[in-house]
Amino acid sequence: MFIYVDESGSFVPATRSDSWCVVAGYVVPEVVRKHVERSLSLLKRRVGCAYQNELKLRHLSESQLGRFLGELGDLESTLFISAIDLGHQDPQVVFAHQRKQVDSIRANRPNMLYEEGRASIDDLSGRLERLSPQLYTQMVAQVDLLDQVFRMATLYYAQRLPATLGSFKWRMDEKNSARPLFEQTLTHMAPALIQAKSLREPGISVEGFDHSHFDKCFRM
């Protein structure tokens, strides 16, 4: 499967409610990827947008958007969203949450037998500590999204297109590559946070669903 991830919003603290910021992941089985790309190409052509340019919502009429969503709805693709209203978040609580994560990483330093391990702890905790509050908030939302995809997409496609679970190919928003601290911190933090959550809240496996492709590629 291909998972296209993008965000909307600045993730900065807000003084009023309805200040939503969103990270979304659109999951496309490889067998229908060309159909999705064709629908997007036709939509851009209809509104006069060059294929290499990003299409914004303001470029579309309601009918054009409805038609495009209808085309996507006919495919076995799925959409996952992690959203947060910054108008209801206390900046001090966000800071405390970030501080707690940093401290929890550093707590493992004495357990490292070798200098390489201690250096890795120092590097990761330092990266996390240097994230701005808005990038930390975005990272938390993005990790939540990735966890959703792993938990729910596996259940969905194990019933419909089991072979889709043999590969997860992520396509992140290119803006993240211009923010190396964010991208590198997310890359290092996401696997550990998702694993920790799976230990606290194990994912669901349903007897009779076909997980064979997933198990073959990812089970130890």
Report residues per predicted region.
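An N-terminal structural lobe/cap that precedes and organizes the functional/catalytic core
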Residues: M1-T78
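A two-mode feature
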Residues: A83-M220
